[in-house]
Every structure is written in C-alpha cells, then in structure tokens.
Amino acid sequence: MDDQNKNLILATALSFIVILVWFVLFPPPEPEMPLTGETSTELTPDAATGSLPSVTSDTAPSVVIEGETRSAALEQAPRVEIATDRVKGSISLLGGRIDDLSLKDYRETQEEDADIVTMLSPVGSPGAYYALYGWAAGAGVDPSQVPGPDTEWQVIDGDILSVDAPVTLQWDNGAGLSFTRIIEIDDNYMFQITQSVANTSDAPVTVAPYGILARHGEPDDLKNFFILHEGVVAMADGELTETNWDDIPEFPVDQREGVPAERIENVLNGWIGFTDHFWMSVLIPDPSASARLTTKYRPRADIYQAETVLPAQTVAPGTSVSATTQLFAGAKEWETIRNYQTDGVDRFIDSIDWGWFFFLTKPIFFLLHYLNAFIGNMGWAIIGLTLIIKAILLPLAYKSYVSMAKMKELQPQMEKLKEEAGDDRQKMQQGMMELYKKEKVNPAAGCLPILLQIPIFFSLYKVIFVTIELRHAPFFGPFQDLSAPDPTSIMNLYGLLPFDGPEPGSIMALIFIGILPLLLGISMWLQQKLNPAPTDPTQQMIFAWMPWVFMFMLGGFASGLVVYWIANNTITFVQQYMIMRSQGYKPDVFGNIKGGFQKKTKPDSK
C-alpha cells in the first residue's frame, strides 16, 4: 500500500503540472479589432419628460486631427495645469475634458530615465482616453443650449489645479443659462467635479448632469490573460459587474442610443469605469441620487464609453441647481482604494481583481502588505508569509508526517503481506486495510499538505500578478522586480560573462534558466530524499524527473512565486525531518542521495 500512497501523491503532482502548463500554453485568444472611423452625434433628450435623458454625444470635438503625437494633440486647445505630489497633467478648456494625466510615482519600466506612466490622453493622440462632464438636454431644451465637446470654457478662478486649490470654469450660453464647473483634486487620485447651472431666463429648463469616460480603441498593452479582468467594472447596489473588452461590442443595440449598450437603472451608491492591469478610471456619482450606469460601444468611431447620468432637474427662472461627481483616475493601490471605500465608495476594494479564491487572495495580500511595511522588503515579506502559512498548516502537516513515519515502520509487514498474497491483489489489499486499521494509519494522509498547497499557490500567483504593490518590487541583487521572471541566466554564468542573458519570457530564457528556478529544483530534489526512492521503476523515474521538470516549467513565472516555492520546500523539508525523527523514524537523507547515484543492478532471476 506504500506504492498506492505514492501513486496518490504522484497523481496530485501530475495534475498540478497539467494546470500550470495550461496557464503557460493556453492563454485566451486575441480579440478581433472592430472597424475604425469617426462619426458625430449629438445630445438628444429622452421622449419622456422628467426621465433620464439619453447621452449619445460624440465625446470628441467636431474637428480632430487623428494620428498626431500626444504633445501635438495637447497643443490643440488652451489648458489649465494639474500639479500635485502624485500626478501631473492638464484640463482642456475645449469641452472642459480631463484628458491629460500622468502618475509621478510610476514609470513604464525600471530604467531610471523611463517615462512616467500616462493615465489619460487627449483626443487626436494615440489611445485617446479622457473624462467629459456636462448636462444632457431635457424635454423642450435645444441641445445647442447646453455645453458639449466643442464648448470653450473660461477660467474664472484658479490658475493651477492642486490639492486645496480648485479650478472654476464657466460657460454662458447667451440665452439665460450660465454653467459653472468646480474641479478639485485630493492628494492621491480622486477628483471632485461640482457642476451647476443658473437660469436667468423667463422659462424653466430641464437638464440632467452626466459624466463620461471615453477610450478610443482597446488599450495597446492588454494582457489578455484569463486570470486578470480588463475592461469595464461597475458596482450597482452592492453587486459587482465585470465586462471584458471583447464582450462590449456584442451588447444588443440600444434603441435610444443606436449603438451596442448596456444600462443599469436606478442605482444608488454605485460606480462605473475602466480597469486595466494596474490602473483604473472610475466615475462615482452622488451615492444618494438614483443614477443610470451605461456601458457603450460606438463601432464606427471605435470608442468605448462608461457613463453616469443623474435624474433630470428642472431649473426654474431665477434659480440654480448643482450636482457633484467624483472621478478616480490612477493606480489600483490597495491602501489608497481601501481608504476611499472607508470614505463611502461602496466595495471599492473589489475593483482589484481578487479572483475566484478571493477568500484566500485578500488575506494573503493583507499579510504581504503589512509584512512588507514591517520588513521593508517584499522578497523577505514573501518568505515571512510562507512561514505564517506553514505555521497555520502545521497541525495538519504534523498528522500527515506522523502517518508517513508510521507507514515506514510498517514497511516490513507490508512486504510480508505482498509475499504471502502473491498475485492475489484482492487478498493483498484486504490484508493491507486490516493492517492500517489495526495500526491506525491513514495511507492517504500524505496527500493532504500537497492538496492544501494548490489553492494557496494559485492565490499567491494571482496576488503577485494583479497587485501593483508587487510591480517592480525589489528583493536583492539582480532580483529587482518580483512580478517578473528571474532575470539571471546560466547562458552568461549568471552575470559573470560580459553579455546579457536571453530576454525574459522567451524560449531561450526557459532553457537557460536563472538562479531561482535552479534553487527550486534543488529544494524539491532534497525534499524527496527524506524518503527512499520507490521500488517501482516507473515511479522511480517519474519522481527522479519531477524536480527538474518543475524547475524548467516555473522558470518563466514571476520570481516572487518561485521565492515562495523555494521557501515552502525548505520549510517543509525541516518540518518533515523533525516530525519523522520525533516518531522514531530517522530519515537517511545522505544515504538516499548516495543511493540515487548508485547504479542499479538487475536482480538474479529465480
């Protein structure tokens, strides 16, 4: 039955290999790009007076020079500067769009002179991405009487938008309506936009405040990896909705919008926006107002839109109304987003893609975050996390290793039963079960620690892949990005030879592995040497190859994950050795290593 126990462990390990190979070899297919081109529509009121008007406007100005550089596009309109400790950019006075934003704390690569990350870009530049606010015309109101994408706003207060220094814009339609927009920003990534309209005419008007996030085409840096959500994310009445980029054009055509769209009506305390790997933009309407959240795709213009529209308001002569909306545009930092959730943004922490194992990924990241804050190094934080996980699982591991030690003690009796049963496998199995029952041994107990490690491994992989705190997180020496594969390579003797190794992620990098995968293979191999090699030749060969197969297979994974696996193997080795010795079984590690290198002689036939 010892062979059966090894078969159980082997089956689990091979299943694990299949799952990991699937991650590497079978990412989701690339989506087809939709047709491109520009079109122009305008704000049109809903047929029902007093209901939410449709927002079907072209978010771009009527005159756009496509394909120009970002710097050239920024020069097409007067601007108000945005400057804080964490972001820089500008607001276009043409349309009042927030369309120029970069994140000072993040660079595109780890090079010291690398460009900082660009979050929002103006119309006309590659990958235009911006936020637009305004008032949708209600029943009886001419759309030309409300501000649109071609509206030229005037600055009436504030030269530079910064923390505690808002900017106020104004536009008068010349027909008795004056529109004012106050834009504020905090010390992180949250804008607050307060829109108001004053009616000095002789007749009441009905308008509805809206906010639009527009992206021209899909992002160029899509990961297209099924463990990561990229696309639209929305929260409506406590329910999170995620829509992938390639699913948005497949929406049914909305009769009022005339384009593929999906609406969520009468939402309280909701939000909607676009999420990327590490960055996100989200519209957050007044939580006390009943809002409509819309995801929309304009196929001819190839523009994706996320919209919020608040209920229409009637502005009587001589009065004014206002509405406040927030805009988050920045990095998906756990602590920053958690603070916004504490301030009232419902379930904002779930904008980070925690995955199916959220009940594991959330606490794992929580521990990593605070271990890193305490230690000051994410690599050592991963090792500390491994120690904590192994300590939590120690009671189960103890029972497993005790059972394995007892199995070793029963080996002579098991061999005797095999000899007595001969070819009668049923008799042998019955005898084995009686022996296990008598000695109170569970032959499958050795599988339990391995089974428990599988969801933990996947959860940590998810955390390392999706959280920005692991992006460019250094360990030591050459390991300056724990979210990237090991940059070292045996090709240049790990930096001793005067040339670079293969590009990380390439086929050559999988062959000429780095230091960390090598240590992983060695740690797995040593862990096996706690027990004698299986007597079955097939099992013996599979067990002999397994550490080195894992070594090459995991060589292309994030180095932080490999650090976890090395630490896990090392701690498991120590735990198993000490527990088995405490039960009277003394693992002969050096003897098993020596035996593994000895040439096996074929037994004499009888």
Curated annotation (Swiss-Prot):
BP terms from Gene Ontology: protein insertion into membrane; protein transport
NCBIfam families assigned: PRK01318.1-4, yidC_nterm, yidC_oxa1_cterm
Show the taxonomic lineage.
Answer: Bacteria, Pseudomonadati, Pseudomonadota, Alphaproteobacteria, Rhodobacterales
Membership in a protein family: Belongs to the OXA1/ALB3/YidC family. Type 1 subfamily.
Q: What is this protein called?
A: Membrane protein insertase YidC
Instruction: Name the segments for region: Disordered.
Output: 33-59
Name of the gene encoding the protein in the UniProt record: yidC
Stated membrane topology is:
Multi-pass membrane protein
Q: Which InterPro entries does this chain map to?
A: Membr_insert_YidC, Membr_insert_YidC_N, YidC/ALB3/OXA1/COX18, YidC/Oxa/ALB_C, YidC_ALB_C, YidC_periplasmic_sf
Molecular function GO labels: membrane insertase activity
Species this chain originates from = Roseobacter denitrificans (strain ATCC 33942 / OCh 114)
| Location of the protein in the cell | Cell inner membrane
- Spell out the Pfam families in the cross-references: 60KD_IMP, YidC_periplas
> Sorted alphabetically, which CDD domains does this protein's record hold?
5TM_YidC_Alb3 (cd20070), EcYidC-like_peri (cd19961)
**Function of the protein:** Required for the insertion and/or proper folding and/or complex formation of integral membrane proteins into the membrane. Involved in integration of membrane proteins that insert both dependently and independently of the Sec translocase complex, as well as at least some lipoproteins. Aids folding of multispanning membrane proteins.
> Single GO cellular component annotation?
plasma membrane
Q: Report TM segments.
A: 8-28, 116-136, 348-368, 374-394, 448-468, 506-526, 542-562
